[in-house]
């Protein structure tokens, strides 16, 4: 069950990452055209950067599900098969630990309970926590940066899901996909 949920989530991550890749290309082309016409749109660069960040985090999370992450296997290739499997589970455990740490950092950074306790009053929240995550605007888009930074939640939740699925043996098997 968890493996199917992980696979569906990874497909969604990849689909959204692909849409973002197309949007980055379109934004860069728009930027080139408008600059060559002498009417540059000042917000295009920032939006392309944010789209690229979202694309990278979504792709990285999906890569964990599909087992397509970068790996140095010089040591594990020399091990007997049984030890290779143990090493792979150890890596899956470390990835899950990293994902859980990311969730914890997001929890600390966004402080949702403190925000609720302040009655969603940003001034009271900032005064009590000295946390200005919800107040900082983007440079040119006029959006609150917490919307941009929310990709960290998506990344951490996806990595946790994929890491757990891989650890219990329900993640995608890269060897099965190659055949």
Feature roles, as predicted:
Residues 1-179:
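Alpha-helical transmembrane segments and membrane-interface helix-loop junctions
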């Amino acid at each position: 069950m968890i493996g199917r949920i992980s696979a569906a989530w990874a497909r969604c991550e990849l689909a959204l990452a692909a849409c973002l890749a197309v949007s980055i290309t379109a934004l860069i082309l728009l930027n080139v055209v408008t600059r060559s016409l002498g009417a540059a749109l000042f917000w295009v660069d920032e939006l392309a950067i944010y789209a690229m960040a979202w694309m990278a985090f979504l792709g990285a999370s999906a890569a964990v599900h599909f087992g397509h992450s970068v790996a140095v296997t010089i040591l594990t290739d020399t091990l007997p098969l049984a030890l290779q499997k143990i090493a792979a589970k150890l890596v899956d455990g470390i990835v899950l630990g990293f994902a859980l740490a990311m969730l914890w950092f997001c929890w600390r950074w966004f402080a949702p309970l403190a925000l609720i306790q302040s009655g969603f009053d940003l001034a009271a929240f900032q005064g009590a926590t000295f946390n200005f995550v919800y107040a900082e605007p983007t440079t040119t888009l006029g959006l609150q940066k917490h919307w941009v930074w929310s990709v960290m939640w998506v990344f951490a939740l996806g990595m946790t899901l994929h890491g757990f699925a891989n650890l219990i043996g329900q993640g995608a098997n890269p060897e099965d996909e190659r055949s």
